[in-house]
């Protein structure tokens, strides 16, 4: 069985959290799941086995930060390969899996899949000048919205918007599609090194240094503002950044 998780826009749609959610859902349902990614931003080429589930077998530099994070969160077999067909075959050979989640594969046509899931940021859909968006490299679109007809289900990520809303002009692209809604909700703060969990109120109003290194930093800042964390002092870095020693020292 194969499920593809992808999008039609550049960055910030919530694809990696959806990959983690789908993978854990399948794993908890009894499937032996493997995740295959191209390994965006990695410093290696070819096929790399990232994890067999119980341990990470490579460095974040060799596989890329997204699949590295997914492997830690899901504890399933995972691999990277720019050739998805060869990568899928090798991942099946090297691990006892019966289900593959293809990360960021909506534009890839060479592997037959049982379901194509596409996640879209609702704010992008509702932008008034939406139809002026251009295809890469001139704009934000990987492909036209007409391509959604290939999808089996669409996940509308409303993030912090109060309700699901689709622009009237856009509704024709969503007809006869299964539409699901995703949103963000802060639950707690976690010290990942010491594995200590803190209540949201523990940081309420305190002076903080906020560090972000994701495609859509505003969504992260919105989370903190919603739980009354002071975000005045912040360091905003680009997505997939390799941090220098000077930057790490600055954060500390």
Language-model regions, residue ranges each:
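Anion (oxyanion) recognition and catalysis
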Residues: 27, 72, 225
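Conserved beta-strand elements of the Class I
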Residues: 34-36, 118, 208-211
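Phosphate/Mg2+-binding loops and adjacent switch elements
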Residues: 40-42, 46-174
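Short phosphate-binding/catalytic loops that engage adenosine nucleotides
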Residues: 31, 75, 229
């Amino acid at each position: 069985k194969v499920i593809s998780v992808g999008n039609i826009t550049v960055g910030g749609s919530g694809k990696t959290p959806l990959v983690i959610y789908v993978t854990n859902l399948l794993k908890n349902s009894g499937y032996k799941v493997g995740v295959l990614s191209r390994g965006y931003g990695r410093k290696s080429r070819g096929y790399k086995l990232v994890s067999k589930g119980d341990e990470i077998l490579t460095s974040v530099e060799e596989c890329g930060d997204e699949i590295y994070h997914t492997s830690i969160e899901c504890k399933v077999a995972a691999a990277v390969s720019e050739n998805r067909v060869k990568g899928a075959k090798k991942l099946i050979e090297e691990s006892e899996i019966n289900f593959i989640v293809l990360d960021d594969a909506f534009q890839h046509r060479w592997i037959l899949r049982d379901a194509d899931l596409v996640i879209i940021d609702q704010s992008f859909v509702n932008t008034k000048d939406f139809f002026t968006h251009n295809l890469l490299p001139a704009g934000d679109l990987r492909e036209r919205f007409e391509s959604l007809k290939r999808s089996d289900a669409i996940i509308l990520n409303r993030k912090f918007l109060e309700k699901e809303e689709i622009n009237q002009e856009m509704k024709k692209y969503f007809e006869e599609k299964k539409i699901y809604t995703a949103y963000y909700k802060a639950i707690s703060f976690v010290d990942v090194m010491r594995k200590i969990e803190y209540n949201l109120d523990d940081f309420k109003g305190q002076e903080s240094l906020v560090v972000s290194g994701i495609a859509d930093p505003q969504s992260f800042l919105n989370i903190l503002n919603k739980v009354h964390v002071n975000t005045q002092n912040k360091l905003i870095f680009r997505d997939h950044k390799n941090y220098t020693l000077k930057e790490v020292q600055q954060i500390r």
